[in-house]
Amino acid sequence: MRLATWNVNSIRARVVRTVDWMVRNDVDVLAMQEIKCKPEQFPIAAFEEAGYEVAVHGLNQWNGVAIASRLPMSDVQTSFSGMPGFQKGMEGPDQPLEARAISALIDDVRVWSLYIPNGRSLDDPHYRYKLDWLGALAEHTRHELAANPNLAMALTGDFNVAPTDEDMGDPSFI
C-alpha cells in the first residue's frame, strides 16, 4: 500500500492539484487534513473519477479530515475513545467534538487521518486541549493494540509541531 498524508488547507480550493498529485505519484491511500468543508461539500466526484472512494468527516469551514483510497475501505470511524472536545470558554465533558480524526480499515491496516489541535501559546486553553487530545489518542492506541496485537495501524496526519513556516518543505506551494 502506497500511503500519503497531506494537510490540503481547503480541499475545494485544491481538488485538482490533489487528485493530479495522487494519480501522478501512484498513491493508493491519501489521508487529508484541514479539508474545511462538510461531507456534502466535499468534491467526491473528482476522486471517484480517478478511481478512489472517499470517507469524509467535516463540520464546517474549520478543521475536517478525509481518506481517499483505491483499495476498499471498511469500518470507518470518526472519533476515538476518550477523544476530548473543545469550545472556548466552556469546560467539562460536554464540549463539542471537532472533526479531527477519521479512520478506516484498508487492506488489514487501520489507517488514521489526524488533525492534531494547534497548542497556540502555553497559557491558551487550546494548549491544554492539545495535550488532552494527544493523551487520549495515545491511550486509545495502546488499548486497541493490546486488544488486537496483530493489528497494523498507521497514525498519519498533521501533528501541528512545526513552530515556523521554515519547517515546511515549500510554504509557497500552499
Describe the residue ranges of each PLM region.
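Active-site-proximal loop/helix segment associated with metal-binding centers of metalloenzymes
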Residues: 110-129, 168-174
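Soluble or luminal CAZymes and related metallo-dependent hydrolases
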Residues: 10, 14, 96, 129-137
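Proline-centered loop/turn at the N-terminus of a beta-strand
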Residues: 2, 53, 110, 152-154
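N-terminal, active-site-proximal structural segment of metallo-dependent hydrolase catalytic domains
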Residues: 1-65
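Metal-dependent phosphoesterases centered on the DNase I-like endonuclease/exonuclease/phosphatase
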Residues: 50-51, 133-174
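Structured beta-strand-rich core segments of catalytic domains in phosphoester-bond hydrolases
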Residues: 35-36, 42-121
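Glycine-rich, phosphate-binding/catalytic loops in enzymes
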Residues: 20-23, 46-49, 84-85, 129, ...
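Catalytic metal-binding/acid-base residues of hydrolase active sites
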Residues: 9, 36, 117, 160-162
